[in-house]
Amino acid sequence: MKSTLRISLKSGERIFINGAVLRVDRKVALEFLNDVTFLLENHVLQPEDANTPLRQLYFIAQMILINPEGKEQTLTMFRKSIVMLLSCFQDDEILAELKRIDAQVVSGRAFDALKAIRGLYPLEDRILNNQEMAPATIEQIRKEIAPWR
Protein backbone atom coordinates (compact mmCIF):
# COMPACT_ATOMS: atom_id res chain seq x y z
CA MET A 1 0.00 0.00 0.00
CA LYS A 2 1.56 3.28 -1.04
CA SER A 3 -0.50 5.49 1.23
CA THR A 4 -2.68 5.02 4.23
CA LEU A 5 -6.38 4.34 3.88
CA ARG A 6 -8.88 5.95 6.21
CA ILE A 7 -12.49 4.81 6.56
CA SER A 8 -15.27 5.90 8.91
CA LEU A 9 -17.77 3.57 10.50
CA LYS A 10 -21.05 4.40 12.23
CA SER A 11 -22.07 3.02 15.60
CA GLY A 12 -23.05 -0.65 15.29
CA GLU A 13 -21.52 -1.03 11.82
CA ARG A 14 -19.45 -4.11 11.02
CA ILE A 15 -16.33 -4.52 8.93
CA PHE A 16 -14.62 -7.72 7.82
CA ILE A 17 -10.84 -7.39 8.12
CA ASN A 18 -8.58 -10.26 7.05
CA GLY A 19 -11.37 -12.70 7.85
CA ALA A 20 -12.22 -11.24 11.27
CA VAL A 21 -15.56 -9.54 11.88
CA LEU A 22 -15.43 -6.34 13.90
CA ARG A 23 -18.37 -4.28 15.16
CA VAL A 24 -17.86 -0.77 16.47
CA ASP A 25 -19.91 0.58 19.36
CA ARG A 26 -19.58 4.24 18.38
CA LYS A 27 -18.68 6.33 15.38
CA VAL A 28 -15.04 5.64 14.62
CA ALA A 29 -12.43 6.29 11.97
CA LEU A 30 -9.96 3.54 11.07
CA GLU A 31 -6.68 4.21 9.36
CA PHE A 32 -4.99 1.26 7.66
CA LEU A 33 -1.24 1.80 7.59
CA ASN A 34 -0.38 -1.30 5.58
CA ASP A 35 -1.97 -3.74 3.12
CA VAL A 36 -5.19 -5.19 4.45
CA THR A 37 -8.08 -7.13 3.01
CA PHE A 38 -11.39 -5.73 4.20
CA LEU A 39 -15.04 -5.60 3.26
CA LEU A 40 -17.55 -3.09 4.55
CA GLU A 41 -20.84 -4.43 5.87
CA ASN A 42 -22.90 -2.59 3.25
CA HIS A 43 -20.98 -4.43 0.50
CA VAL A 44 -21.70 -7.88 1.95
CA LEU A 45 -24.33 -9.72 -0.06
CA GLN A 46 -26.57 -12.00 1.99
CA PRO A 47 -27.20 -15.54 0.64
CA GLU A 48 -30.90 -14.85 0.03
CA ASP A 49 -29.97 -11.88 -2.16
CA ALA A 50 -27.68 -13.94 -4.40
CA ASN A 51 -30.59 -14.57 -6.77
CA THR A 52 -29.06 -13.86 -10.20
CA PRO A 53 -25.99 -15.36 -11.88
CA LEU A 54 -23.76 -12.31 -11.25
CA ARG A 55 -24.99 -11.84 -7.70
CA GLN A 56 -24.16 -15.49 -7.10
CA LEU A 57 -20.67 -14.89 -8.50
CA TYR A 58 -20.36 -11.86 -6.20
CA PHE A 59 -21.38 -13.99 -3.22
CA ILE A 60 -18.63 -16.50 -4.01
CA ALA A 61 -16.02 -13.78 -4.55
CA GLN A 62 -16.87 -12.10 -1.25
CA MET A 63 -16.25 -15.38 0.55
CA ILE A 64 -12.60 -15.10 -0.49
CA LEU A 65 -12.40 -11.97 1.67
CA ILE A 66 -14.70 -13.06 4.49
CA ASN A 67 -13.33 -16.58 4.93
CA PRO A 68 -9.62 -16.66 4.05
CA GLU A 69 -9.24 -20.17 5.52
CA GLY A 70 -11.52 -21.54 2.80
CA LYS A 71 -9.86 -19.57 0.01
CA GLU A 72 -8.73 -22.56 -2.08
CA GLN A 73 -12.18 -24.16 -2.07
CA THR A 74 -13.78 -20.80 -2.82
CA LEU A 75 -11.37 -20.14 -5.71
CA THR A 76 -12.27 -23.53 -7.20
CA MET A 77 -15.98 -22.66 -7.02
CA PHE A 78 -15.28 -19.20 -8.42
CA ARG A 79 -13.38 -20.62 -11.41
CA LYS A 80 -16.16 -23.12 -12.08
CA SER A 81 -18.75 -20.34 -11.96
CA ILE A 82 -16.74 -18.04 -14.25
CA VAL A 83 -16.40 -20.79 -16.86
CA MET A 84 -20.14 -21.43 -16.69
CA LEU A 85 -21.02 -17.73 -16.96
CA LEU A 86 -18.67 -17.25 -19.92
CA SER A 87 -20.56 -19.99 -21.73
CA CYS A 88 -24.00 -18.63 -20.74
CA PHE A 89 -23.75 -14.90 -21.41
CA GLN A 90 -23.62 -13.64 -24.98
CA ASP A 91 -23.19 -9.91 -24.31
CA ASP A 92 -19.67 -8.86 -25.37
CA GLU A 93 -19.35 -6.26 -22.62
CA ILE A 94 -20.23 -8.76 -19.89
CA LEU A 95 -17.93 -11.41 -21.37
CA ALA A 96 -14.96 -9.02 -21.50
CA GLU A 97 -15.63 -7.84 -17.97
CA LEU A 98 -15.98 -11.42 -16.65
CA LYS A 99 -12.53 -12.20 -18.06
CA ARG A 100 -11.13 -9.12 -16.34
CA ILE A 101 -12.87 -10.07 -13.08
CA ASP A 102 -11.39 -13.56 -13.30
CA ALA A 103 -7.90 -12.09 -13.73
CA GLN A 104 -8.47 -9.81 -10.74
CA VAL A 105 -9.46 -12.69 -8.47
CA VAL A 106 -6.59 -14.89 -9.68
CA SER A 107 -4.13 -12.07 -8.99
CA GLY A 108 -5.45 -11.62 -5.44
CA ARG A 109 -7.58 -8.55 -6.10
CA ALA A 110 -10.98 -9.90 -4.99
CA PHE A 111 -12.03 -6.49 -3.65
CA ASP A 112 -11.59 -4.95 -7.12
CA ALA A 113 -13.49 -7.88 -8.62
CA LEU A 114 -16.46 -7.25 -6.31
CA LYS A 115 -16.63 -3.64 -7.45
CA ALA A 116 -16.51 -4.74 -11.10
CA ILE A 117 -19.24 -7.36 -10.57
CA ARG A 118 -21.52 -4.75 -8.95
CA GLY A 119 -20.97 -2.58 -12.00
CA LEU A 120 -22.40 -5.33 -14.22
CA TYR A 121 -25.70 -5.62 -12.31
CA PRO A 122 -27.60 -3.16 -14.56
CA LEU A 123 -26.53 -5.05 -17.71
CA GLU A 124 -27.47 -8.35 -16.14
CA ASP A 125 -30.87 -6.98 -15.08
CA ARG A 126 -31.52 -5.86 -18.66
CA ILE A 127 -30.53 -9.27 -20.04
CA LEU A 128 -32.67 -11.17 -17.53
CA ASN A 129 -35.65 -8.84 -17.94
CA ASN A 130 -35.52 -9.24 -21.72
CA GLN A 131 -35.11 -13.00 -21.34
CA GLU A 132 -31.86 -12.95 -23.30
CA MET A 133 -30.70 -15.87 -21.15
CA ALA A 134 -32.74 -19.05 -21.05
CA PRO A 135 -34.49 -19.76 -17.73
CA ALA A 136 -33.00 -23.27 -17.78
CA THR A 137 -29.52 -21.75 -17.88
CA ILE A 138 -30.29 -19.50 -14.92
CA GLU A 139 -31.64 -22.49 -13.00
CA GLN A 140 -28.49 -24.49 -13.78
CA ILE A 141 -26.36 -21.68 -12.36
CA ARG A 142 -28.55 -21.53 -9.23
CA LYS A 143 -28.08 -25.26 -8.66
CA GLU A 144 -24.32 -24.88 -8.93
CA ILE A 145 -24.28 -22.15 -6.29
CA ALA A 146 -26.71 -23.89 -3.90
CA PRO A 147 -24.00 -25.43 -1.67
CA TRP A 148 -22.67 -21.93 -0.92
CA ARG A 149 -25.91 -20.65 0.54
Curated annotation (Swiss-Prot):
GO terms for biological process, alphabetical: bacterial-type flagellum organization; mRNA catabolic process; negative regulation of bacterial-type flagellum assembly
Entry's InterPro entries? Answer: Flagellum_FlbT (IPR009967)
Repressor as a keyword?
yes
Q: Cite the GO molecular-function annotations of the record.
A: mRNA 5'-UTR binding
Q: Which keywords does the record carry?
A: Bacterial flagellum biogenesis, Repressor, RNA-binding
Does Thylakoid count among this protein's keywords?
no
Q: Name one Pfam family in it.
A: FlbT
What does the record give as the function of this protein? Has a post-transcriptional repressor function in flagellum biogenesis. Associates with the 5'-UTR of fljK mRNA and promotes its degradation.
Query: Which family would the database say this protein is a member of?
Result: Belongs to the FlbT family.
Its protein name is Probable flagellum biosynthesis repressor protein FlbT
